[in-house]
Amino acid sequence: MILENLFKNLIYDPVSVLGLLVFYILLVNLPISLGAFFQKKSFFIVRVLTILINFLITLQLLFRWSISGHFPISNLYESLYFLTWGITMGQLLIEREYQSPIIPSIAIPIELLTVAFACFVLPDDLKISSNLVPALRSSWLVMHVSVVMLSYAALIIGSLLSASVLFINKNKPLQIRSSSTGIGGFKISNNYPLNELVEPIEFSHSEELDTLSYRSILIGFVLLTLGLISGAVWANEAWGTWWSWDPKETWAFISWMFYAAYLHMRISKGWQGRRPALLATTGFLVVLICYLGVNFLGIGLHSYGWIFG
């Protein structure tokens, strides 16, 4: 009966059903990812489930696109799933380089919370696809919003990787020798042996995590820069002004300045170890405020749908 209802709903409301499936698979994947620290076979299961999650979100977004007739990043519900897609894709790409249970253990909780927020916190009217206002009926919608959302995904992953570096070194001095340009301390192989997954985390692991964090943040910063530029061009085309300093634009600029300072300190000042890791970890809150926090103000051109109104 449950399966029968599921298939019926899948026909009439595929977006919601696929969204719920993603949530439940993430719910199953979370304890398995934590168990991967003790059983190496669990890491393979986690990776397979993450691939399935990414595929289901892709299907969900495609269904949403076919129903609405526009790329599905026009409201908060759609953007939350697109963000989750970006984080899962980033997780899978990193795991190709560094097969450690640390990666899914930091990514999956965020993915689960993001999907849970979309499924159970957002009001139903935000889950319904609606027609775009004339100003949003532009190819800039895909070029601007998708790039910004992918930058958020990369920046979140980078910040969480830095948090993991701080956590695994909380009771000992942190003297990272990894290179900010990715040359010195990047000792990662595609054939990293699976039997090393359950070994205690050594100093070299911190170097690798730190370098992965730096690279993720660098990618996110480049994408955010492109997103801000494309957004300014779009704003001038739609409203005749390059920048209006609404809350989202202001916090996007703050986020850009924050990560620019992080990269400057690492590249120009040679920061290594605990200080850049603390700075990058704090960046998670900056991105969270930029993406979700300003929605609680309910004002501006980028509110993504007022949550409670």
From Swiss-Prot:
| Keyword line | Cytochrome c-type biogenesis, Membrane, Thylakoid, Transmembrane, Transmembrane helix
Q: Where in the cell is it found?
A: Cellular thylakoid membrane
Signal peptide (from-to): none
- Record-annotated membrane-spanning stretches: 18-38, 43-63, 67-87, 102-122, 148-168, 216-236, 250-267, 279-299
Q: Which Pfam families match?
A: Cytochrom_C_asm
A single GO cellular-component term on record: plasma membrane-derived thylakoid membrane
InterPro entries found in the cross-reference section:
Cyt_c_assembly, Cyt_c_biogenesis_CcsA, Cyt_c_biogenesis_CcsA/CcmC
List GO molecular-function terms, semicolon-separated. Answer: heme binding
Biological process per Gene Ontology, one example term:
cytochrome complex assembly
Could you tell me the membrane topology recorded for this protein?
Multi-pass membrane protein
What is its biological role? Required during biogenesis of c-type cytochromes (cytochrome c6 and cytochrome f) at the step of heme attachment.
The subunit field of the Swiss-Prot or TrEMBL record says:
May interact with ccs1.
Read off the PANTHER family from this record.
CYTOCHROME B_B6 PROTEIN-RELATED, HEME EXPORTER PROTEIN C
- What NCBIfam families does the record point to? cytochr_II_ccsB
Family the entry assigns: Belongs to the CcmF/CycK/Ccl1/NrfE/CcsA family.
Q: What is this protein called?
A: Cytochrome c biogenesis protein CcsA
Name the gene behind this protein.
ccsA
